[in-house]
UniProtKB/Swiss-Prot annotation:
Component of the SWR1 chromatin-remodeling complex composed of at least ACT1, ARP4, RVB1, RVB2, ARP6, YAF9, VPS71, VPS72, SWC3, SWC4, SWC5, SWC7 and SWR1, and perhaps BDF1. SMART domains: DEXDc, HELICc, HSA. A motif (DEAH box) lies at residues 824-827. The lineage of its organism: Eukaryota, Fungi, Dikarya, Ascomycota, Saccharomycotina. Residues 708-873 form the Helicase ATP-binding domain. It is found in: Nucleus. One of its GO terms (molecular function) is histone binding. Residues 564-586 have a biased composition (Low complexity). It comes from the Eukaryota. This is Helicase SWR1.
């Protein structure tokens, strides 16, 4: 038994190896075929006996996952995964019985598989040799005819199955390796054939084939021999496999049209598959020869198609392509089906189209309904799901909300506690800071007292020295008086009476006390050297310059004393340096009104409310100014003069001005004259430099002397003359003095605002052309070019640059050494924290000069900025002391008294300590400042006279003015009291007063044009009726002329010769021949149709033939008619002939002699007559007709439709009229358009009538005028007026560019032929100096009176040599006269409301509607007595808001001009505006609110502060 079993096991193992070798052989064969297909695309050259073993073949197996190692690993993994499924018992049973895929092989590793492959390699090679032998034997047996032999039942089924798959391969090709395997081998699985053609069998366990090729079909798979034996053994069980049968029942066809029914060519699928045959097995010799013949015929057809051009060879696709109809370019007649053709013409559809459309529509409906149901179901399911989720998480969500609420409460409590502790910490710091400040304040007062005491002693020494110098030229008593007067002035009007002088002098230490009076004669007897020894310990403050001067020696004391004394006396003797003479004495009524009105302090002007002393925040950007009219002076002592009032000057000099009685005015003027004389004696006179072209006025020469003394004493200074006094020329004269006298040619640096950069350059070229001036501006590249070579000596003398560019290129400017640095408009350099201020401070300069047109401001930070810029360090007792370098200490010294001034306003004079501290502050700055006002030097300037010219309204103006006032809408507007509505009405009234054309333009008259006259409507109807009548007559009437029955007409046009020639042109014979041919053709067509009763239109051929027949009949009829016409025209014969009639006719026209004079006068061309009567036309052609008609020309010339003139003649005449020039064009134009007369421009306006008389007088006397107006449209009217009178003029308005203004002003100032310069008051004031004119005419007054003052200053300024006359035009009995009258009653300055040059709301807040309109105001106006602007309105508090409201009532051009003017005024803001970050103002309010919240818990706050003070908090 054991031996038999062993032998049986060996046989079984040998059989297993044989089967495995067979599988390996087939695997190699199939993989080689796939690789050959991939590489060469075709199997034509494929050799099955060649087994590839290259690297590319192995790479191909790895990429396609066909390697046996990978397949084995995948098979084992799949088996391991599928072993867990309990429903695959049948598959596991098959795997256990299998000899190849056993449970032992599943655990084999990669090395075992390679060993098995090597063991079966000889068997595989034997299989390969057998295949070679079979292939060679098969090639030898090809010539033998295959004989049919009986085959078994299984082979029949396999053959049928192979045939079936061959047919399916043609329709649905399968992978080639499967087909080759099926064709060449008989190792095919035995599967039962389906019983029906439409039944598909699907095996239940498809997963058993996953270990084999994935491309095998479901019905065929490869198995080992052991599996085949197992299948044969299991057949006896008769166990049926589960099958799925799919039975298809196609629907019955509903279309009954036999053309639409498709009949299959085969009755069953089996017959269809059996129709395919294999070339190798199933074909006989006859069938093969027949197949070869068919292929030959097909090939010959293809060649013929290529030769004929029906086919073409495509190289890209390597195939034959048919030729399209476009390429053939042949016309293919398309004859559609008659029924479809008939349907297409009527836009109908056949039955098939209806069915298809209905099916498409129904399918869309089904799809849309299905989608809608699915969407609704999804929505409902989501709602249900969300509901249950919400119900499930309610408790958890409630718990989370409670926890979140507890956390928020805890967080709020922690924040509140922390906030409270922070507040306590801030309070502790404030208390601690107050204590430290108190200590510093005590130390600062001691330091300040020492410093001011030394400054006071220095000033005493300077005054005594000046007294010595003045004694040589004047008596001692006079010098003492002058000295006392100068002392009174230098005290900044701290004294208003002799008693007050003594009191203040005792405090300040500057006046003549008994001790000082005793020392005075002793000092007078001493010389300069002895004074130096006596006051040597009083070392005055001197300026220490930048780093380059640190090694230089400091100036000696005598220089400081002389410079200080000279500058101080100069400033003391000029009454305008620290005292304002602008505030004249006011009468008792004004004083009483001022006493009644409450004073507004500086804190109210700031708009920030009152602040405590400790919390006062000084803002650098604010302008601490107090208007002279808003501050009242009160009595300082009981013995003070009653009419003296202390005012706080707006310029900010912290001074009091003394108002004297009218009787004392003369005494004051005499004192001023004596002071001017003393100034000339006290200041060292310097010669006028030769480089300067031009004459300096007296005060300008004194300014040069003062500037020269500053330079000689090595001191910086501030020239603060009022605007218009010539600070520019004084600066140029200083630089010229340095060049001529000191041989100091610079270079000097002048930093100016951008707007006046060009003005400075022009002033240098005008007054000092000897200087080399470098104007530094342009792009970065241009500025770089200008810097090239500027370090060379004498490259330039003066450099003019703007503030913006000097900061941008500060590195280049810092490297250069400058002699003098001049800052124009220096009052704008007030923010010491800005980079601009720091950059200018660090420049390498020897001297510094500040130019400002406004006095010093009250802001301590600005004062400190100027002091530090002039004196970065001071020297006291021979030591460097940064006296003003510490801003905090400076504010502590002077801040509290100035804060009291700001807070209390007018009551600051009651505080003696405050008054003395302010005086000390100005004593420090006094030696370095020079300021003069226009009022002080007005005797040296031309006088200014103002005249008011009243103008009557013209008739047209009065009519428009009264008509506007009488309107119901105007009355309602004035009665409403609305400010904007009233201003609109006032603006309209002002337009009427300026010129009526601004309110209502005088119209240009034209005639009313009618396209047709009245009779033309009836003529159209008549013409239509006549045409209808003529049409009926033409139908019934026979044309005899056409039939040659009117014989007399032939003699009118034809000659005998022409008639004979025309008769030869007859062609009747040709017509007859063509007609006969067409009739024969038509006869043939008629025979084809026969006697058909009706025409079948559904037959296209029959329809086309019928249409051709109809065309032939029409052609025959037309040719017959043409034959008759030709015959009638050629048969015309004249009786006599035109040639014979012309020969026998005599011309009766008389020829006139053209040389006769009488004939020439009678017969004149139209153009000559028009030229001769031109004067008559110009004189009397003035009446424009009210209405004209355009068709009258045709009626006058006889060119209308009803004219008896023929149509051809009318066309010729009309054409000639178009070609001929119209000599009556001028006459037609004058009668068509009536322009207003030019003289009406003047006589319609009363102001222009007065202006015409005034300009004639000014021109005769050699005067030149400036005419200003607010409205831009008035400039247009003035232009027309000046052109009408022939005046040379120039115009400047808001549209004029800034660079063009300089050219216009220079031309006007130099060209005396130009009489008038018309300007807009809104045209801007930058760069306009019109001193060439001596007359200013205000055609109308501006809303803003500051604009009028600015316009006056353009003419009345430095450089004017003649008296200036100002004429203001006012219309009588109008709004303008009422405003002027009210202004005179209130005694406003210069008849306009000007308050320190600012535009205030007093202009409207003090005027009511009744004041403006007078008796013309309606009686029912309820608010007539109320002011235009109430005190509570926003416009009353904000002038800018008022300007915006007025702009809404003005024209658009005027508003644009005003905006441009304001923009130019603020053009320099970019140079100076560098604001710092500020804290929000509402922080303090929040802190107060927080403190109020915890009111009543002081004990807790005290505990917290004590806790922090004891050091437990930190």
């Amino acid at each position: 038994m054991t031996t038999s079993r062993k032998s049986h096991a060996k046989d079984k193992k040998a059989g297993g190896e044989q089967d495995l070798a067979d599988l390996k052989f087939r695997y190699d064969l199939l993989t080689n075929e796939l690789f050959h297909l991939r590489e060469f695309v075709s199997l034509v050259d494929y050799d099955p006996t060649h087994f590839n073993d290259s690297e590319s073949f192995q790479k191909f197996l790895r990429e396609t996952h066909l390697s046996l190692e990978e397949r084995g690993e995948k098979f084992t993994d799949d088996v391991a995964k599928k072993g867990t499924n309990g429903d695959l018992t049948r598959r596991r049973r098959n795997l256990r019985t299998s000899t190849v895929v056993s449970s032992e092989t599943t655990n084999e590793k990669k090395g075992d598989i390679e060993l098995k492959l090597e063991s079966i390699a000889p068997l595989v090679r034997n299989k390969c040799e057998e295949l070679k032998y079979k292939l060679s034997d098969h090639s030898n047996r090809k010539s033998i005819v295959p004989q049919k032999r009986p085959i078994q039942h299984l082979k029949k089924r396999e053959a049928a199955k192979s045939l079936k798959f061959k047919s399916e391969r043609k329709e649905n090709p399968l992978p080639l390796h499967e087909h080759i395997a099926e064709e060449r081998y008989d190792h095919i699985a035995k599967v039962e054939e389906p019983s029906e053609a439409f039944t598909i069998k699907c095996p239940s366990d498809d997963s058993s084939f996953e270990n084999t090729s994935e491309h095998y079909s479901d019905n065929f798979y490869f198995t080992t021999s052991s599996e085949e034996e197992d299948i044969k053994k299991k057949r006896g069980r008769k166990k049926k496999k589960p099958r799925i049968k799919l039975v298809v029942h196609p629907p019955k066809q509903t279309i009954t049209n036999p053309l639409h029914v498709v009949k299959p060519g085969y009755e069953s699928l089996h017959e269809y598959i059996a129709s395919f045959k294999s070339l190798e097995d199933d074909l006989t010799l006859e069938e093969y020869n027949k197949y070869i013949d068919e292929q030959r015929r097909l090939l010959s057809r293809l060649k013929k198609g290529i030769e004929n051009g029906a086919l073409k060879y495509d190289k890209e696709t390597d195939s034959l392509q048919p030729i399209t109809s476009k390429e053939i370019k042949t016309i293919i007649t398309y004859k559609p089906d008659p029924i479809s053709y008939f349907y297409k013409q009527q836009d109908l559809q056949i039955h098939t189209d209806h069915l298809i459309n209905q099916g498409i529509h129904m399918s869309k409906l089904f799809r849309s309904s299905t989608k809608a149901r699915i969407a609704r179901a999804k929505k409902v399911s989501q709602m249900i799901e969300q509901h249950f989720k919400h119900v499930a998480g309610a408790e958890e969500r409630k718990a989370k909300e409670e926890e979140r609420h507890k956390k928020s409460l805890a967080r709020f409590a922690v924040q509140a506690v922390k906030k409270r502790w922070n507040m306590a910490e801030k309070a502790y710091r404030i208390l601690r800071k107050d204590e430290e400040e108190q200590l510093k304040r005590i130390e600062g007062k001691q330091h300040l007292s020492k410093m001011l005491e030394k400054s006071t002693q220095l000033l005493e020494a300077q005054l005594n020295q000046v007294n010595d110098d003045g004694r040589s030229s004047t008596p001692s008593s006079d010098s003492n008086d002058v000295l006392s007067e100068s002392d009174d002035d230098m005290d900044d009007e701290l004294s208003t009476s002799s008693d007050e002088d003594e009191e203040v002098d005792a405090d300040v230490g500057l006046e003549n006390s008994p001790a000082s009076t005793e020392a005075t004669p002793t000092d007078e007897s001493l010389n300069l050297i002895q004074l130096k020894e006596k006051y040597g310990h009083f070392n005055g403050s001197s300026t220490v310059y930048d780093s380059r001067n640190k090694d230089e020696k400091f100036p000696t004391l005598d220089k400081h004393e002389s410079s200080s004394s000279e500058s101080s006396v100069m400033t003391g003797e000029e009454s305008s340096i620290y005292s304002s003479s602008e505030n004249e004495s006011q009468n008792e009524n004004d004083r009483e009104s001022d006493d009644k009105t409450p004073s507004v302090g500086l804190s109210a002007l700031f708009g920030k409310g009152e602040e405590s002393d400790g919390d006062l925040d000084l803002d650098d950007s604010e302008d601490f100014t107090v208007n002279s009219s808003s501050v009242e002076g009160e009595e300082l002592e009981k013995d003070q003069v009653d009419n003296s009032a202390a005012t706080f000057e707006r310029a900010g000099d912290f001074v009091h001005t003394q108002n004297e009685n009218r009787d004392d005015i003369k005494d004051v003027e005499e004192d001023a004259e004596t002071k001017v004389q003393e100034e000339q004696l006290s200041v060292v006179d310097v010669p006028v430099p030769s480089l300067l072209r031009g004459n300096l006025r007296t005060y300008q020469k004194q300014g040069l002397n003062w500037l020269a003394s500053l330079y000689n004493n090595h001191t910086n200074g501030i020239l603060a003359d009022e605007m218009g006094l010539g600070k520019t020329i004084q600066t140029i004269s200083l630089l010229a003095y340095l060049a001529c006298e000191k041989e100091n040619w610079g270079p000097h640096l002048i930093v100016v605002p951008t707007s006046v950069l060009l003005n400075w350059e022009m002033e240098f070229k005008r007054f000092a052309p000897g200087f080399k001036v470098l104007t530094y501006y342009g792009s970065p590249q241009q500025r770089k070019e200008k810097r090239k070579g500027w370090n060379k000596p004498d490259a330039f003398h003066v450099c003019i640059v703007s503030y913006q560019l000097v900061v941008q290129d500060q590195h280049s400017f810092k490297r250069k050494r400058w002699q003098y640095m001049v800052l124009d408009e220096a009052h704008n350099i007030k923010n010491f924290r800005s980079t601009r201020w720091q950059a200018l401070l660090n420049f390498n300069t020897q001297r510094r000069l500040l130019l400002t047109g406004t006095p010093l401001q009250n802001n301590l930070a600005e004062l400190w900025s100027l002091l530090y810029f002039l004196m970065p360090q001071t020297v006291i007792d021979g030591k460097k002391v940064s006296g003003f370098a510490d801003l905090d200490a400076f504010q502590q010294w002077f801040g509290r008294p100035v804060d009291k001034i700001i807070e209390t306003g007018q009551n600051f004079g009651q505080d003696k300590e405050t008054k003395k501290t302010v005086a000390k502050l100005h004593q420090v700055l006094r030696p370095y400042l020079l300021r003069r006002l226009k009022a002080d030097v007005e005797k040296q300037m031309p006088a200014k006279y103002e005249h008011i010219v009243y103008c009557k309204l013209s008739k047209r103006q009065r009519f428009l003015y009264d008509d506007f006032m009488s309107r119901a809408q105007t009355k309602a507007t004035l009665a409403s009291g609305n400010f904007m509505s009233i201003v609109n009405c006032l603006m309209q009234l002002r337009k009427v007063c300026n010129h009526p054309n601004l309110f209502e333009v005088r119209p240009i008259l034209t005639s009313f044009v009618l396209e047709h006259c009245v009779a033309s409507d009836y003529k159209d109807v008549e013409r239509t009726l006549l045409k209808l009548f003529k049409k009926n007559n033409q139908v019934n009437r026979v044309d005899l002329d056409f039939l040659n029955l009117v014989f007399t007409l032939n003699d009118k046009d034809l000659t005998s010769y022409h008639a004979e020639e025309i008769s030869k042109l007859t062609c009747v014979k040709n017509f007859v021949e063509e007609v006969n041919k067409l009739r024969e053709t038509n006869k043939q067509l008629q025979e084809e149709f026969g006697e058909a009763s009706f025409l079948n239109f559904q037959d296209a051929n029959q329809y086309f033939k019928y249409s051709n027949k109809q065309k032939l009949e029409g052609t025959v009829d037309m040719l017959n008619f043409l034959k008759m016409v030709n015959k009638l025209r050629c048969d015309r014969r004249p009786i006599f002939g035109k040639n014979l009639i012309d020969l026998l006719t005599k011309d009766r026209r008389v020829k006139y002699d053209k040389s006769s004079i009488i004939d020439n006068e009678l017969i004149k061309p139209l153009q000559t007559r028009v030229l001769d009567n031109r004067k008559i036309i110009d004189t009397f052609a003035v009446l424009t007709p009210s209405a004209v008609s355009l068709d009258m020309r045709k009626l006058a010339l006889g060119l209308n439709d009803d004219s008896s003139v023929g149509e051809n003649t009318r066309l010729k005449v009309m054409q000639n009229c178009f070609e001929v020039s119209n000599p009556l064009h001028q006459l037609q134009t004058k009668l068509t358009i009536a322009f207003p007369d030019k003289s009406l421009l003047q006589y319609d306006c009363g102001k222009l009538q007065k202006l015409a008389i005034l300009l004639q007088q000014l021109k005769d006397n050699g005067h030149r005028a400036l005419i200003f107006t607010q409205m831009t449209k008035v400039l247009d009217v003035l232009e027309q007026f000046l052109n009408y009178h022939g005046y040379l003029y120039m115009r400047l308005d808001g549209a004029t560019k800034i660079e063009d203004r300089q050219i216009l002003t220079e031309r006007f100032n130099t060209d005396s032929r130009i009489t008038v310069f018309i300007l807009s008051s809104r045209s801007g004031g930058l760069g306009i100096n019109l001193t060439g004119a001596d007359t200013v005419i205000f055609y109308d007054s501006d809303w803003n009176p500051a604009m009028d003052k600015q316009c006056q200053d353009r003419c009345h300024r430095i450089g004017q040599t003649r008296d200036v006359h100002i004429y203001r035009f006012v219309s009588e009995h109008t709004i303008e006269s009422n405003i002027l009258k009210k202004a005179n009653q209130k005694r406003q300055l210069d008849n306009v409301v000007i308050q320190e040059g600012d535009f205030t709301t007093d202009y409207f807040s003090k005027l009511s509607v009744r004041d403006l309109l007078g008796s013309e105001l309606p009686e029912n106006a309820s608010g007539g007595d109320k002011p235009l602007i109430a005190d509570a309105d926003v416009a009353a508090k904000d002038p800018r808001q008022l300007e915006r409201l007025l702009a809404q009532a003005e024209d658009e051009d005027d508003v644009k001009a005003a905006n441009l003017a304001m923009r130019e005024v603020e053009i320099d803001n970019d140079d100076f505006d560098e604001s710092t970050e500020k804290k929000a103002a509402n922080e303090e309010e929040e802190n107060h609110a927080e403190l109020d919240e915890y009111e009543g818990t002081a004990h807790v706050d005290e505990y917290m502060i004590r806790f922090i003070a004891n050091g437990y908090y930190y």
